[in-house]
Amino acid sequence: MTEADYADFLVVGGGTCGCVVAARLSEDPSATVMLLESGSGYRSALELPDVLGDPYRLPVGPASEYTWTYPVELTPRRASTIARGRTLGGSGAVNGAYFMRATRADFENWPSAWRYDDVLPYFKKSETDRDFESEFHGTAGPIPVERRAWDQLHPLSGEFHAAALGAGFPDDVDKNAPDSFGVGRVPLNVADHRRISTAIGYLMPALHRPNLRVESGVNVIRIVFSGTRAVGVDVLDDGNVRRIHADHVIVCSGAVATPHILLNSGVGPAEQLAEQGVSVILDRHGVGQNFVDHPEVLLPYHFSTPRAIRSQTPVLETALNLAELEIRPYTASFTDLVPGVPRMDHGVGVVLMAPRSRGSIELASGDPAGAPRIRYNYVASTHDRAANREGMQIAENLLESIAETGLIDRPVVEYTDEWVESRLGTSLHMSGSCVMGAESDPFAVVDDRCRVIGAQGLSIVDTSILPTIPTRGPHATAVMVAERASAILLGDE
């Protein structure tokens, strides 16, 4: 067996988590680490295309070379398309640089080994916070975190903050504090007007290590097993299938691709696998189930007078966070941010951050190269529909207050099911499709050490394992999970 087709640790997916895991594992010079990425790869930050470092543009449009796109069913009556990162750094390399952590309360329903006090050291290890120095913030981590200066805020962001305070909502000075609640500035993984993904912050500084190898442009089609032990993967490389062997396979392909890879490998609900002609290795009912995201309804607003697009303005500078809701005053239309999308209004996002509805990711065919069947089952629960309307009312009231300043016209909002569903979208915060839980839980896929239950030599490290979706965007939490999982894999925990 040659060096080219073997590694001690084989990391599948060079997205947000995969870049962290590969960089941290390769800190052990005695371990060989190989990272496989389906999209584009770069040897240094100097090679990075400008659009991947520009936090004011979102290269996720229909013609983007940096994303995978998937057809999805948001509701039985509303189809859509989602985009996932297809480059080193993954979706964190193409998003709006929102870097809020999960709150202390979010971890109360996680396994006991993953409570807030257990994970705080890894949040801190991941970051250099440029605005706060306290026991809750890191000062020497790979990801810089900063908030937009008050005097540089877009007018809408400033008026939104003032309107929310005027409505009686608390001033949320530090949104990465453990019990964050209220209105305040959004933490961003940005430094010097540059989006710092985990590819830039973690992976590229490690590429000089002789024990770390990165292959880009290769698609993993299945995990290879000997019995129930993972011994490698099959990849599609320039149209040819190639096998790479490993002592330990770590799947970091995200909440869509990870369950899809497992299902194609024979790990998942036995009945579903049999229907598609896939041989069953492990009957794990939870693979692809419990899929959850943050549903979002966009309420339109219009500036009272035409305004020039501000070229260096983050898409989201302030936000209102409540127990189960997030209200997002976007500073620009997504038409101006995302190349190739249809004309859209400026909007304020009303987002359910603790939805009860759950969806699924299943095999649509036995072809590993085919797209999975993705059903969101959005707003199926009565609770979600009521919470959504509560959020819409709050957002409408805030827009009315902003309109009184003359900045925007008065909003026009309808509350019919048809109007709401026509504006329903997703935050692209996919989670939960291979959840972490107790071995006795038939729907758990990994244990509290990120090991696939019933398998050997196989771990999952990405947002698919989150037991519950955070009430904040998952990016910062994903980095924390990858930091802690790396420590577990290295035997430091």
Curated annotation (Swiss-Prot):
Active-site annotation: H429 (proton acceptor)
Similarity comment text for this entry: Belongs to the GMC oxidoreductase family.
Keywords, in A-Z order: FAD, Flavoprotein, Oxidoreductase
Cofactor names: FAD
Keyword DNA-binding on entry: no
Binding site residues for FAD: 8-37
InterPro entries for this protein: FAD/NAD-bd_sf, GMC_oxidoreductase_bact, GMC_OxRdtase, GMC_OxRdtase_N, GMC_OxRtase_C
Organism: Rhodococcus erythropolis (Arthrobacter picolinophilus)
MF annotations from Gene Ontology: flavin adenine dinucleotide binding; oxidoreductase activity, acting on CH-OH group of donors
UniProt enzyme class: oxidoreductase
Protein name per its UniProtKB record: Uncharacterized GMC-type oxidoreductase in thcA 5'region
EC numbers, comma separated: 1.1.-.-
